[in-house]
A protein has these predicted regions:
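N-terminal small/polar loop signature for handling phosphorylated ligands or for N-terminal nucleophile
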Residues: 1-56, 103, 133-192
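Gly/Ser/Thr-enriched, mixed-charge loops and adjacent short helices
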Residues: 57-175
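Conserved hydrophobic "DFG−1" position in protein kinase catalytic cores
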Residues: 61, 192-194
Length: 194
């Protein structure tokens, strides 16, 4: 819900420090990490609340190939509070890497036999990529809550909680599917039902 506002503020801030910003749009976190390497950026920021309730949001940061954590986060906060920031005139360009991302996965993976899958994206951002990718891999896909909606109207997008995969379990049984896949809100966690 606050994602677009945070994303725009972040992009403006990075540009004001002289950075070249590449906007790949709304994407699952693994695709954002892929983009950093694929586009030779080395760094990336995902605006995400992950598997938290919709009123929460945050940033996952990779700087120069390293995930920002612990001391680096404290240091970044100090620099922001002290206004110890670079200034410059950056740039912004939009790039759609969805097909490149899918092609990379398709090239790297082989499925021994076509699978019948039920895919529950929990209305998270994986819904924009996962069903199509799995079909391109040769799977038969039945979608469950794959329309992206940050209010998560059907269930909380945390596949580690049994109450969030009840419908998925039922559909796997009813359809005699090989597997059920449940993604979290930003697509970097996966629950598997067999």
């Amino acid at each position: 819900l606050s994602g677009p506002m945070l994303q725009n503020a972040l992009m403006r801030g990075l540009q004001s420090s002289g950075m070249e910003v590449i906007d790949i749009g709304q994407a699952p976190t693994p695709m954002i990490y892929f983009a950093a390497v694929h586009l030779d950026a080395g760094s990336c920021v995902a605006v995400t609340g992950s598997h938290n309730p919709p009123e929460y949001n945050g940033l996952k940061v990779v700087a120069a190939g390293e995930t920002l954590s612990a001391d680096a986060i404290v240091d970044l906060r100090r620099r922001i509070v002290e206004n110890d920031l670079l200034e410059g005139e950056g740039s912004l360009r939009k790039v759609d890497i969805t097909q490149d991302y899918m092609e990379r996965i398709i090239t790297d993976m082989q499925i021994e036999k076509p699978l019948k899958l039920v895919v529950d994206c929990g209305n998270g951002v994986a819904g924009g990529v996962a069903p199509e990718l799995l079909r391109k891999l040769g799977c038969e896909v039945t979608e469950l809550y794959c329309d992206v909606d940050g209010t998560f109207p059907n269930h909380h997008p945390d596949p580690s909680k049994p109450e969030n995969v009840v419908e998925l379990k039922e559909m796997v049984l009813d359809l005699k599917a090989d597997l059920g896949l449940a993604f979290d809100g930003d697509g970097d966690r996966l629950g598997v039902i067999d």
